[in-house]
Amino acid sequence: MVEAIVSFGVEKLWDRLTQEYEQFQGVEDRIAELKSNLNLLKSFLKDAEAKKNTSQMVRHCVEEIKEIVYDTENMIETFILKEAARKRSGIIRRITKLTCIKVHRWEFASDIGGISKRISKVIQDMHSFGVQQMISDGSQSSHLLQEREREMRQTFSRGYESDFVGLEVNVKKLVGYLVEEDDIQIVSVTGMGGLGKTTLARQVFNHEDVKHQFDRLAWVCVSQEFTRKNVWQMILQNLTSRETKDEILQMEEAELHDELFQLLETSKSLIVFDDIWKEEDWGLINPIFPPKKGWKVLITSRTETIAMHGNRRYVNFKPECLTILESWILFQRIAMPRVDESEFKVDKEMEMMGKQMIKYCGGLPLAVKVLGGLLAAKYTFHDWKRLSENIGCHIVGRTDFSDGNNSSVYHVLSLSFEELPSYLKHCFLYLAHFPEDHNIKVEKLSYCWAAEGILEPRHYHGQTIRDVGESYIEELVRRNMVIAERDVTTLRFEACHLHDMMREVCLLKAKEENFVQIASILPPTANSQYPGTSRRFVSQNPTTLHVSRDINNPKLQSLLIVWENRRKSWKLLGSSFIRLELLRVLDLYKAKFEGRNLPSGIGKLIHLRYLNLDLARVSRLPSSLGNLRLLIYLDINVCTKSLFVPNCLMGMHELRYLRLPFNTSKEIKLGLCNLVNLETLENFSTENSSLEDLRGMVSLRTLTIGLFKHISKETLFASILGMRHLENLSIRTPDGSSKFKRIMEDGIVLDAIHLKQLNLRLYMPKLPDEQHFPSHLTSISLDGCCLVEDPLPILEKLLELKEVRLDFRAFCGKRMVSSDGGFPQLHRLYIWGLAEWEEWIVEEGSMPRLHTLTIWNCQKLKQLPDGLRFIYSIKDLDMDKKWKEILSEGGEEYYKVQHIPSVKFEKDYK
């Protein structure tokens, strides 16, 4: 609902006015009036959100409030920034500008007055058109829809599922938990909407083994808005005789509790709670359960941790989506009429098209059923082809805002969206920026959220922007709205994506809320522009973008280019940006600039917080870049041999992420000592900056250092000594340079107690002993070290290591040995470009958890170790093409890898 999103914006604006109140000397009365009006808006939005009204008039009022909030926020921030700029100017200049200051404040007061008038008009319109009554009416209809849905779920608890496909194994497993596992009392079935959780629970509920095991059975659908008393009444009615129904309805809550507690204590009962939404809902219900073990509970929910806290006798079961084959079987039952009992009537061409369409369902049973229903009454190839052309919208089934189809994919999945807190609604809608199947990087996403004010200050508590953003992703994953897995080495969510059906809902919601304007194809003519009033604009895979011609919204706050072609760049034209002074996010990944220069007009974007020029084709940055004092994210790792960077970064005190160019002229000097809030600093070079500048950066989590002139190890380690939060350290030197070989003789700084990832690209013929490495190291990468001795006997004693990379000439010897008991946690091993390596011995008992093994471009290695046969955990093996003949089925070494599910031969370095 847009009300929740706008309400979030009003709250942020209110907080800003409160925090910056001392800045508004001379206009205090106007600010007080504005805060009073904001209070009125907050009350209205709170009411509209709580009652979930969907009328067009209410939406119109809310949209107008949203525009007012955006404009007010921009106006206030512009005033504060200009005031700060004046304070930084010299005394003489200040004296000469006193008159200008008075004029500026008068203009600001006038602007506030204009905003207040707009608020008053919205409030007047709400009274004139009876908006408050519409909200109340909408609340009643929303409640009726919820009640109807609850009744449907309750009615079908004992129904037979004619379209039950692919769940037999799951039913057996769940029945086992309930019937055979005495130590398990609570079983939850969790997953995204439409996955078939309720269908699965029905099969378990009606299973003969379950009926035989339990004396009493109860099925209770828990609506989103329920009372504890009502739920307890339904449980008692289910568990007792029908004659007591009226008596139960007369009971008070305390009496219900006592009756249920005693009943569950003295009988073997199973209670199914279908569709619990919140952990606190379960907390309200569960006081009726006694400590004794006779009872069991089966829960269905979209939230994975619904009954987890404080309960050791709990197991969560997460069904997987249907396979393509299972989806096809389910689809046939619904879409294709039978010729006889064993055969479906279907044209071969239609079958091929049907199989293509079900792929779009992503294995979601509800989506497959909806698709089957849509095609059941369509009998020609032409009908099927026409539907396939816009399959996403057809399956999701979104109509207008008053859509009452409770079984549509849109309705089922959008319930999860409506249940989100306001800030997470923003986060979810932001994912509409990205194309289908795009791997969304969580770190960059977190900084975009922070730049737009979506990350709430109350969630920081000393955490980094990345930490807070990741906690939001974790919450969306827990609610089964986003798909992401933690990286085994970092234990972080590195990337995420959406299920195809959830993405369709995300796009539709974003369109409803006018959240972002998505451009996949540029306007066909030079005179056409992208219409629309959204404050966010994303262009997906453009070949050319002419900013001043193609974008006509001066209130734009976010401009993102999502570019997925790794080999080519796209052209950026008309890039003065002067008309887009309110931008907060600007992502120009792989842009090719006119004249290879970043325009000086970039300095006018004083609101900018996020600027990404990663792999852009630009040779020179303007000194006006220093005006961007609100930047928290700056990536200038451009795709040119040498980038001119003016010494203008010192004033960017808010920077949290700075990625410098990999190659910069040694004449360029950059002062960085003021950037004490940095959390990530990449491509720092001793050729362009002083190691002394690092000493104040105590908040760094990630640091990449390039050593290009003689530096003692004492000087280097003294610079990073105070970085007690450092997790990821990379050190590189010029290729083959031996003057830094003593840097690592005694190992890395032991004071770096949180260091988890270490990347060394330097000449280092001897590896330090294992005691000279941080004890919690999970990942190490060695590149160009020219190690003479086998590194594995040392590395395998680092007990927390989960990833090892040996890159080009990391080891120059001939023989490596992996010992029994070595690398107990290792998950991934990458070996590339070891030109002299001939033999690898793997003892039985080595690397017991290895999942991925990659060996490329090791020309002298003639055979894989026999010990690979004993590593049963390996799932992926990736080799050069030259190995294909001997490792494929029938090959002389196939017996060593036949237990590995995925063996690939992708590269050839001959």
From Swiss-Prot:
SUPFAM superfamilies per the UniProt record, alphabetical: L domain-like, P-loop containing nucleoside triphosphate hydrolases
Q: Where does ATP bind?
A: G191, M192, G193, G194, L195, G196, K197, T198
| Role noted for this protein | Potential disease resistance protein.
- UniProt-listed PANTHER family: DISEASE RESISTANCE PROTEIN RP, DISEASE RESISTANCE RPP8-LIKE PROTEIN 3-RELATED
- Supply the domain comment: The LRR repeats probably act as specificity determinant of pathogen recognition.
Q: Which family does it belong to?
A: Belongs to the disease resistance NB-LRR family.
**The protein, known as:** Putative disease resistance protein At1g58400
Origin species:
Arabidopsis thaliana (Mouse-ear cress)
